[in-house]
């Protein structure tokens, strides 16, 4: 199957488009890096390019998990970090009965013939920002289609009985391997039957669930931030459609309004 996917050019195209996106992104960044205005709107193309300052934080997870436990929220917010459990033989054996069904993903490897098919490098023309923005948007649409096609193809591979059995299948361009995701666990069963220790030591907040608790006013962002320490600052460069930017702003404002409404209800 993967051999046909390669031969038909689907994977090489995906690989090329990923490289092209990175190169176009870098070209636009270089054009804008010395500008005073760190946010440029391209009205005709309905796109925006901007530099965004982002803090890098270190989180005291054990301290935060203790805090969640004291508030009665720990198993509702946290998942067990399977990677860290794998490194601890005692807890790996202790929690074995609470492990969820194993999930898998596929990984391609390439021989010389496969690498030759994937080696094409994009050449980005030295054009103005407007032209590069158009190239970026064209690439984004093509890349979205290529990614969707590959994700659908991988789902089919995961169901392949031969790959499930052998875990690795060779083909003309290399091989395809089936690998296990880190284990996931039933955190409620662990909390109720084993106790909170494993969740406190190895738990990591599920950000979506944590956001829901913040929105409901059950815990504040200030409480969460108390367990974070900023260790660095970086400047990210982002290119997106104006519609996407507006949706992000709308979602943020909606979330803030929901938090305010919940605070009023509890006042």
Q: What do these predicted ranges mean?
A:
Residues 15-123, 144-267:
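Extended, charge-rich alpha-helical segments
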């Amino acid at each position: 199957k993967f051999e046909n996917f390669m031969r038909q050019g689907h994977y090489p195209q995906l690989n090329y488009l990923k490289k092209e996106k990175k190169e176009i992104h870098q070209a636009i960044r270089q054009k804008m890096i010395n500008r005073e205005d760190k946010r440029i709107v391209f009205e005709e193309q309905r796109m925006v390019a901007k530099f965004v300052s982002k803090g890098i934080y270190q989180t005291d997870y054990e301290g935060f998990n203790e805090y969640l436990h004291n508030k009665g929220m720990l198993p509702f917010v946290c998942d067990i970090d399977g990677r860290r459990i794998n490194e601890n033989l005692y807890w790996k054996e202790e929690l074995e009965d609470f492990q969820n069904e194993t999930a898998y993903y596929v990984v391609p490897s390439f021989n010389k013939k496969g690498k030759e098919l994937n080696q094409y490098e994009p050449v980005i023309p030295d054009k103005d920002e407007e032209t590069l923005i158009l190239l970026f948007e064209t690439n984004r649409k093509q890349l979205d289609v290529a990614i969707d096609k590959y994700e659908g193809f991988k789902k089919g591979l995961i169901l392949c009985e031969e790959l499930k059995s052998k875990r690795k299948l060779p083909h003309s361009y290399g091989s395809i391997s089936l690998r296990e995701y880190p284990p996931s666990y039933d955190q409620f069963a662990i909390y109720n039957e084993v106790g909170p220790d494993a969740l406190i030591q190895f738990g990591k907040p599920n950000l979506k669930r944590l956001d829901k608790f913040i929105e409901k006013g059950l815990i504040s962002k200030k409480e969460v931030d108390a367990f974070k320490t900023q260790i660095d600052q970086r400047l990210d460069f982002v290119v997106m459609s104006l519609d996407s930017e507006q949706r992000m702003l709308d979602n943020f404002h909606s979330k803030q309004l929901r938090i305010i409404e919940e605070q009023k209800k509890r006042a």
